[in-house]
A protein has these predicted regions:
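Exposed acidic/Ser/Thr-rich ligand/metal-binding surfaces
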Residues: 125-129
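Catalytic-core regions of hydrolytic enzymes
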Residues: 1-124, 136-148
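Active-site-adjacent mobile loop/cap segments within catalytic or ligand-binding domains
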Residues: 80, 131-182
């Protein structure tokens, strides 16, 4: 699943020449989708295919509904220092994993099928939390591996802001079962 960051009334960052992040991310997402779809063994889906707003949780829900194997959220940030440049890759932090697990446990609708189709409805709450924590930890490890691969590829075509995968608690990366990067 390819997520073009921002959209609709949420324009994201504004470039020095007046460009909007939402337009840049959508253009990149469409090009990436085409490149992936050109490989007969792969199929890409977009979380949004035009200029409209999709809530952060809705992006993750769509990826899960479409049974995505990976989730890539594309952003084109701006910074107050015009000298700042380069690409970065983020994965969810371990500290974010705990809050993601708590969020999913609190929401009974989403409790089932979070970890490989195993329903947690009939499990002891502590066991369910442990299973979600284990699933989230494994997913974060896979996300960092994916992020390192992407950084290697990006380094061949663009400057890197940081040469390692950074980790933070981005809401859009909090799927406990889909390796996700931003």
């Amino acid at each position: 699943a390819i997520d073009a960051g921002h959209g609709g009334e949420d324009s994201g960052a504004r470039g020095a020449a007046g460009s909007f992040e939402k337009n840049i991310t959508l253009s990149i997402a469409r090009k990436l989708k085409k490149a992936i779809d050109d490989d007969e063994q792969l199929k890409a889906v977009l979380t949004r295919d035009d200029d409209y707003f999709v809530p952060l949780h809705g992006r993750v829900v769509k990826a899960r509904k479409l049974k995505a194997d990976l989730f890539v959220s594309i952003h084109a940030d701006a910074f107050t220092n015009p000298e700042a440049k380069g690409s970065s890759v983020f994965a969810l932090s371990e500290s974010g994993a705990t809050s993601a697990s708590a969020k999913y446990l609190a929401n009974k609708e989403n409790e089932s099928d979070l970890i490989g189709g195993v329903s947690l409805d009939d499990k002891d709450p502590m066991l369910a939390k442990t299973l979600l924590d284990l699933s989230q930890s494994a997913t974060i490890n896979d996300s960092v591996k994916l992020g390192n691969f992407v950084l290697d590829q990006l380094g061949d075509i663009n400057d890197l802001h940081k040469s390692n995968v950074e980790q933070a608690g981005f809401a859009v990366l909090k799927s406990p079962d889909i390796p996700s990067i931003l």
